[in-house]
A protein has these predicted regions:
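N-terminal helix-rich module
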Residues: 1, 9-42, 46, 50, ...
Length: 136
């Protein structure tokens, strides 16, 4: 009887430990986008050409986002890994990625269903997942 109870408790704990797949997908999208933004930032500094990142509307006809200003042959991916991901830049239409070493404070919110993640930089540090800002 004790063994049955232990198995029931262990399986209920395992059920609680399972993660939401959309949350994992959004975390993967955020990590990938942060890497792409830093790659574009490095290319911008290396070439001395201003590069910006713009999200695109969610539609079967458009790509998920685009990098404007990259030199030919140095293009980066323009699609999300999965369907339904969208991005919104806070306070401006595009992220400015250089060529200056300090680019200014910038934030964007990634969304997938009811999940949200914020990527941000203080202008000197790389883009990374950040805590949500609460209005005061």
């Amino acid at each position: 009887m004790l063994v049955v109870v232990l198995i029931a408790v262990a399986s209920s704990l395992a059920t609680f430990a399972l993660r939401d797949p959309s949350s994992t997908q959004l975390e993967n999208e955020a990590a990938r986008l942060a890497s792409l933004l830093e790659a574009a930032r490095a290319q911008s500094r290396a070439t001395g050409i201003a590069v910006r990142w713009e999200p695109r509307p969610v539609s079967p006809d458009t790509e998920g986002f685009r990098f404007v200003g990259l030199t030919p042959g140095n293009e980066l991916p323009r699609r999300w890994l999965g369907e339904g991901v969208s991005a919104e830049i806070i306070g401006q239409p595009a992220l400015m990625l250089g060529p200056e070493p300090i680019i200014g404070r910038q934030r964007l919110v990634l969304r997938l269903n009811d999940q949200r993640l914020t990527l941000a930089t203080d202008g000197l540090s790389p883009f990374a997942v950040a805590a949500e800002e609460t209005p005061q």
